[in-house]
Design a protein with these regions (language model features):
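Short alpha-helix
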Residues: 143-157, 161-163
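Conserved beta-strand signature within the Rossmann-like core of class I S-adenosyl-L-methionine
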Residues: 119-132
Length: 236
């Protein structure tokens, strides 16, 4: 994802309003080894990294986007380290105890990275739906879905466990104009746009005077757990 000041502001508002990242962290936590050093790969602005910290010794948050990492650095807590660069080249001195790939990367790529950088479990969080939610028209998510991930793991003979769950990640807005900017920012359709009336029809009453409008979004997700020892060298 290409981050901008506006997209970061939208996400921080949504994260503050919902327990989305906390919910994901709570699903991962029971499967983490004790005193673990984990990597949040493709961390973005690090909201999940911060939510994971109570369940482990240290979190290394990695993303290639400089603005995203600068945003995380401005809100760091003890036990979280932010690193800016390509996951492929930013290998740790010692292998991570676990790695989290939340809505990040092709499954084939994550398996390759994890095999080189992790000695324990990897957690792949994928969208459990097939089309982009904020676009005009029907825009496919392509290979970044649960079905695609399952196909890759099965084809390579890699055992895994899977857990489906939902987490509310709606977007609060300070104005209708902000909602229009949001849909313009996240519309992936090349030929269609939503009208003001269509946007307004998707909104509900917001939670406060500061945020009078709200876009509900109960996000269907799937958590795949894979042991790196089960990833054969020939599969990567």
């Amino acid at each position: 994802m290409f981050w901008t000041e506006e997209s970061i502001a939208f996400l921080r508002d949504a994260a503050a309003m919902n327990r989305y990242y906390e919910t994901i962290a709570e699903r991962i936590a029971p499967q983490l080894p004790e005193n673990a050093h984990i990597c949040d790969a493709g961390c973005g602005i690090g909201e999940l990294s911060l939510a994971l910290k109570p369940y482990c010794r240290h979190v290394t948050a990695v993303d290639a986007d400089e603005l995203a990492i600068k945003t995380l650095e401005a809100h760091l807590i003890e036990g979280v380290t932010a690193r800016c660069g390509d996951m492929e080249t930013l290998a740790p001195e010692k292998p991570y105890d676990a790695m989290v790939f939340c809505l990040f990367g092709r499954t084939q790529d994550t398996l390759r990275i994890a095999k080189k950088q992790c000695r324990g479990r990897i957690f792949l969080v994928k969208r459990d739906y097939s089309h982009h939610r904020f676009s005009a028209g029907k825009v496919s998510l392509g290979e970044y879905t649960v079905g695609s991930t399952e196909n890759v793991l099965r084809e390579k003979g890699i055992p895994y466990t899977v857990e489906r769950f939902t987490a509310e990640f709606g977007q609060p807005f300070r104005s209708l104009e902000a909602a229009e900017r949001f849909f313009a920012l996240y519309n992936r359709s090349r030929s269609e746009t939503l009208s003001k009336d269509e946007i307004k029809a998707r909104l509900t009453v917001g939670p406060s005077a500061e945020f009078p409008y709200y876009l509900p979004h109960e996000k269907a997700l799937c958590l795949f757990t894979v042991e790196t020892t089960d990833i054969p060298e020939e599969a990567i």
